[in-house]
UniProtKB/Swiss-Prot annotation:
GO cellular component entries: MCM complex; MCM8-MCM9 complex; nucleus
Gene Ontology biological-process entries: DNA damage response; double-strand break repair via homologous recombination
Protein name, per record: DNA helicase MCM8
Lineage: Eukaryota, Metazoa, Chordata, Craniata, Vertebrata
Matches recorded under InterPro entries: AAA+_ATPase, MCM, MCM8/REC_WHD, MCM_dom, MCM_lid, MCM_OB, NA-bd_OB-fold, P-loop_NTPase
Residue span(s) of domain MCM: 394-601
SUPFAM superfamilies, per database record: Nucleic acid-binding proteins (SSF50249), P-loop containing nucleoside triphosphate hydrolases (SSF52540)
Annotated SMART domains: AAA (SM00382), MCM (SM00350)
Length: 830
């Protein structure tokens, strides 16, 4: 029994040996002999095709009216196919507009821009394809292929017509057909509606055509993606081209030669049958508006793949509108760790068109219309902008609408409003000149509890593009640019920080004094309006054309007027000098002001309409006449105030955001001669008063700041020319800012105090004091002084300081005095 079993079926039986021997001897020998003989004597011959099939195939090729059918569709041509009917409808649509397109540009780029609104508004097209929007959304690949084939056919016919005309002109015979070879052309739709929010991109969107808007936060390197790959059969050497959909590597299943049974294939990347395209991946983060903000949720991101002419169409920080098809990819990293993850997929978008919000000027008119601004205005919005502009005292209305919850501080709000509108950047396109920034920077310094952070958040909220960060929780790379390694490919990619994301907008930085070493990262961004990066072999520069609005608390919790701004904040002069306006907010007790403030707070808490009236303590000393004092009949502060009992209707932030966006986009003011003269006189007067000072805080930066703010004041009222009144308003705001900076502890204006000066506020007094101590030490042969002796010396020299111990501490910090004991100091200048 066992022998029979072994002989019949077991591996070690004779039957198996005989079968194996027969296989080895007969089949292998015959195969080898036949193969060797054929290779030496006879060439491979394909099986003869019947004449009928050859006739049918040639007839099909001859009678297909579309020469590029095989470029777009894999199925055979049929007259009654619905795709043929759609292609004919699109062909009529493009034939009417062929003269509007640049044919050479279309052939060079391999794509054509099609306005979606024109498609759905064309009567003939909607009559032929009634539900075109639904079909485009549900089966985008086929509709886009029909559009591509239609424009391919239109260009082919156009070229044939031109070739025939040339033949007639040259007098050539019209017997032969000209060879017309139009490449594959993609139809790229823009202005597609509706826009899909990123949170709604779920599994039910798979395979659908959608449009979404967001900020580019990461851009990968450009790589070649193989769309068709040639494979060589290892048996017969026949070459076949295999399409690779979505870039997924697939091997051919069998050889195309009927007699060959080969199953091993090697890819031939250098074959003319291999086709590659440029490929790039970008990560897009959703744009958060008021009604879409969700507390505690990280902004959603999605990967988008760009191919061919779409690569390099955006950089980190750009606001883009991407239309494309939602597709899925498997999680390759997770698949190796857990087998269950093979069923988990990631959604990504295969981009069909990218509309960049930069609005850059391009040579091609099509591209210029394509690269729209990131703010779109409906007819209702434009009417609202017109209504706002027609208001009387518009500056007063906008200033008081900026942050109605905060009481008073009209001049500070006016400075923030000017930063919101911004000036005009000069020499942007001129490669031979250095660009001059147009965005003003504002710093608010003051005691805690005066509403600095709320004003900052209000400005970022009103800005069309605002980023709000807190200084003590942000890093320097989080503010500028991060270089991250891509997990899948291992390449380095740029990730934009707060300043790059706030490009052409506002970046609000709260707790500015607690940033530590991150201050140095802001220096280049604040003046050059760009961020340079040199890390891991990548050297590049990213735009950061943003206005920085910062709020800071002084060291010690209370602003000490005996010290300069630099000493109060422990901040370098290089950074402070880049701020156009520095406002000092002091919590000074005033009975009338406190009474109105308490009424305002109680009204807000009770839910009533806020009382917007204000009373501001005068900070100008009457005894000290200076160029900084306001001598106008009706100063700006009086004009900005809301009188008690007045019913003030503030502009809603949503509407104000549209107004600011419209002004920044379409209004580009320039200085009139009268305004320029007013600014020049004020600047020269400041320089004249400052001549005798030991330090010179007034530089050309202050003059540039005045020009920027004057342009912003004109832009606020949608005027193209800056008037004399604009310049006078800006000068009053600048005076208010400088009064806080240059006032000493006694309320007097001291031009020896530099707002960004380092060291002692009272330099001349410190020099006299140290020289007196040096002469005493030489006379007594002792350089040790106790605190009582130091007080006596200061009294004899009539040195008046607000806090004597702080005065001595500052001398200790600067190295003039060395503390030897509890109340003992050693002079170090001997």
């Amino acid at each position: 029994m066992s022998r029979d079993l072994r002989g019949r079926g077991c591996p070690r039986g004779r039957g198996f040996q005989g079968w194996r021997g027969g296989w080895r001897g007969g089949w292998r020998g015959g195969w080898r002999g036949g193969w060797r003989g054929r290779t030496q004597k006879v060439e491979w011959k394909r099986a003869p095709e019947p004449a009928s099939s050859r006739l049918v195939q040639s007839t099909l090729d001859q009678f297909i009216p579309y020469k590029g059918w095989k470029l777009y569709f894999s199925e055979a041509y049929a007259d009654k196919s619905p795709f043929v009917q759609k292609t004919q409808a699109f062909e009529k649509f493009f034939m009417q507009r062929i003269e509007l397109y640049d044919k050479d540009e279309i052939e060079r780029k391999g794509s054509i821009l099609v306005d979606y609104k024109e498609l759905i508004e064309d009567r003939e097209l909607t009559k032929s394809i009634p539900n075109i929007s639904t079909e485009l959304r549900d089966m985008p690949q086929k509709i886009l292929q029909c559009m591509g084939l239609a424009i391919h056919q239109v260009l082919t016919k156009d070229l044939e017509r031109h070739a025939a005309e040339l033949q007639v002109q040259e007098g050539l015979p019209l017997d032969g057909e000209p060879i017309i070879n139009v490449p594959l052309i993609h139809a790229r739709l823009y202005n597609y509606e509706p826009l899909t929010q990123l949170k709604n991109v779920r599994a039910n969107c798979y395979g659908k055509y959608i449009a979404l808007r967001g900020t580019v936060v990461r851009v990968s390197n450009i790589k070649p993606l193989c769309t068709k790959l040639a494979f060589v059969c290892g048996t017969c050497g026949d070459v076949q081209s295999v399409p690779l959909p979505d870039g997924k590597y697939t091997l051919p299943t069998k050889c195309l030669v009927p007699e060959c049974r080969g199953r091993s294939f090697t890819p031939d990347r250098s074959s003319p049958l291999t086709a590659t395209v440029d490929w790039q991946s970008v990560k897009v983060q959703e744009l958060m508006s008021d009604d879409q903000r969700e507390a505690g949720r990280i902004p959603r991101t999605i990967e988008c793949e760009l191919v061919q002419d779409l690569v390099d169409s955006c950089v980190p920080g750009d606001v883009v509108t991407i239309t494309g098809v939602v597709k899925v990819s498997s999680t390759e990293e997770g698949a190796s760790k857990n087998k269950n993850d093979k069923c988990v997929f990631l959604l990504y978008i295969e981009a069909n068109s990218v509309s960049n919000s930069k609005g850059q000027k391009t040579k091609n008119f099509e591209e210029e219309t394509f690269q729209r601004s990131f703010m779109e205005f409906s007819l209702k919005d434009l009417y609202a902008v017109q209504e706002i502009q027609a208001e009387e005292n518009l500056f007063r209305i906008i200033v008081n609408s900026l942050c109605p919850a905060i009481y008073g501080h009209e001049i500070v709000k006016a400075g923030l409003a000017l930063a919101l509108f911004g000036g005009c950047q000069k020499f942007v396109d001129d490669k031979n000149r250095i660009p001059v920034r147009g965005d003003p920077h504002v710093l608010i310094v003051g005691d805690p509890g005066l509403g600095k952070s709320q004003m900052l958040q209000a400005v970022c909220n009103v800005a069309p593009r605002g980023v709000y960060v807190c200084g003590n929780t942000s890093t320097s790379s989080g503010l500028t640019v991060t270089l991250s390694r891509d997990g899948a490919s291992g390449d380095f990619a740029l990730e934009a920080g707060a300043l790059v994301l706030g490009d052409q907008g506002i970046c609000g930085i709260d707790e500015f004094d607690k940033m530590g070493s991150q201050h140095q990262a802001l220096l280049e961004a604040m003046e050059q309006q760009s961020i340079s990066l040199a890390k891991a072999g990548i050297v590049c520069s990213l735009p950061a054309r943003t206005s920085i609005v910062a709020a800071a608390n002084p060291v010690g919790g209370h602003y000490n007027k005996a010290k300069t701004v630099s000493e109060n904040l422990k901040m370098g002069s290089a950074l402070l000098s880049r701020f156009d306006l520095v406002f000092i907010l002091l919590d000074t007790p005033n009975e009338d002001h406190d009474h109105l403030l308490s009424e305002h707070v109680m009204a807000i808490r009770a839910g009533k309409q806020a009382v917007c009236s204000s009373a501001v303590v005068s900070r100008t000393n009457v005894q000290d006449r200076s160029v900084l004092e306001v001598v106008s009949d009706r100063p700006l502060l009086e004009r900005l105030k809301i009188s008690p009992g007045e019913n003030f209707d503030a502009i809603p932030h949503q509407l104000l955001r549209k107004y600011v966006g419209y002004a920044r986009q379409y209004v580009h003011p320039h200085l009139s001669p009268e305004a320029a003269q007013v600014l020049q006189e004020f600047y020269l007067e400041l320089r004249k008063q400052n001549q005798g000072a030991s330090s010179t805080p007034i530089t050309t930066r202050q003059l540039e700041s005045l020009i920027r703010l004057t342009e912003a004041r004109s832009r606020l009222e949608l005027r193209e020319k800056c008037t004399k009144e604009d310049a006078e308003d800006v000068i009053e705001i600048m005076k208010y800012s400088m009064l806080g900076t240059y006032s000493d502890e006694f309320g007097k204006l001291d031009f020896e105090r530099s707002q960004h000066g380092s060291g002692m506020s009272n330099r001349s007094q410190a020099k006299r004091f140290v020289s007196a101590l040096s002469s005493i030490a030489e006379r007594t042969y002792s350089n040790l002084f106790d605190l009582q002796q130091l007080r006596q010396v200061a009294k004899e020299l009539q040195i008046r300081v607000f806090d004597f111990e702080s005065f001595i501490e500052s001398l200790n910090d600067q190295g003039y005095l060395l503390k030897k004991g509890s109340r003992l100091y050693q002079l170090q200048t001997m």
